[in-house]
A protein has these predicted regions:
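N-terminal amphipathic/basic-hydrophobic helices that include classical n-h-c signal peptides
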Residues: 1-15
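Intrinsically disordered, low-complexity Ser/Thr/Pro/Gly-rich regulatory segments
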Residues: 11-330
Length: 330
């Protein structure tokens, strides 16, 4: 019994991270969008147990049988990124979630053994929109409705970190617990509703499985300690968060490197800055002094110099105002 349980757990872990041997590839690529694409496909999910079904979008692709084939595709794209650049140029929004979805759509169009049937399919009742299905795909395991999400959450400075409701988005408008409840209670149920079945039938889909894929980072308080939220994936990506009043103390505990803020569109893959492009200590200090005391949370990255002279991300930190969190209505 124990051996079979272990085999099931190993099989589940493999299905959640089918390309674990490629986990370092994003850092080896050069083009920013290709690095983001590789990160989206290869990074671990936030949660191993989300309270609703999860599925890696490429689980039924031929790439799973030969991960090096996926690695070769990404490396080739890094040398000639025009197809990805053209695809992303169609985006009319700078929203991180839409960028993340677009990266996945590009990959699913290219993935061997996967047919992308629809993306962002609106479900309507007359003139009223009931919801939207992020991804509909067909592979060797059947037809699937997938909801995709990219999230960054900050853990509680004191209290029960195991409670997903205690994990806040940097703008305090979102909670991990609320997001999971919305996914389970609304987004993943849409494809089973009568109006959806009509739309699905038009695509030749009789039955569909609804599943989630949630990527992102969890940021732990400094100083202090928070336990990981219940169900967190053991390999989930992480950083720290701290108030501005603690910044100088934090620096004293850090290895050497160069700090600079990450623009929002750079929040996915580990940052890479070309030789000569990193901020000096003086540049960062000047930026920090000019930053408003109640500025929104800033995602900072510490860079270390590589052998080729480029600067690679070593850690990331959310720096928040001393008054954070400013909860709506608080």
């Amino acid at each position: 019994m124990g051996e079979r349980t272990g085999q099931r757990q190993t099989g589940y872990a493999r299905r959640m991270m089918p390309f674990a041997e490629l986990e370092h590839l994003p850092r080896q690529l050069r083009h920013p969008a290709v690095r983001d694409l590789a990160w989206a496909l290869l990074s671990p999910p936030l949660l191993a147990q989300a309270g609703c079904p999860q599925r890696h979008p490429l689980q039924g692709s031929a790439w799973v049988d030969d991960p090096q084939r996926l690695g070769h595709w990404l490396a080739t794209l890094d040398q000639a990124p025009a197809p990805l650049s053209s695809w992303l140029a169609r985006l009319n929004s700078r929203r991180l979630g839409l960028y993340y979805e677009s990266l996945w759509q590009f990959a699913l169009h290219q993935a061997p053994g996967v047919e992308l049937l629809a993306a962002n399919l609106a479900i309507r009742d007359g003139g009223r929109t009931l919801g939207e299905l992020d991804i509909l795909l067909r592979d060797r395991e059947g037809d699937h409705h997938l909801e995709l999400a990219i999230k960054l959450y900050l853990g509680p400075p004191a209290g029960n970190g195991q409670d997903p409701a205690q994990w806040l988005g940097p703008g305090c408008h979102d909670r991990l617990g609320t997001k999971l409840a919305h996914l389970a209670g609304h987004q993943l149920t849409i494809s089973g509703q009568p109006h959806s079945r009509v739309a699905l039938a038009g695509l030749g889909i009789a039955e569909v499985e609804a599943q989630l894929w949630l990527g992102g980072y969890l940021f732990y308080p400094w100083p202090g300690h928070a336990e990981a939220p219940a169900g967190a994936h053991p390999a989930h990506l992480r950083g720290h968060w701290l108030h501005r009043r603690d910044w100088v103390d934090y620096l004293e505990h850090c290895p050497p490197g160069r700090w600079q803020p990450l623009p929002r569109h750079g929040w996915l893959a580990p940052a890479r800055v070309q030789a000569g492009g990193s901020w000096t200590v003086e540049q960062f200090d000047s930026w920090l002094q000019a930053l408003d005391e109640v500025a929104p949370a800033q995602l900072l990255v510490r860079l270390e110099e590589d052998e080729d002279g480029a600067w690679q991300e070593a850690e990331r930190v959310f720096l928040v105002a001393d008054s954070w969190p400013q909860l709506p209505g608080g």
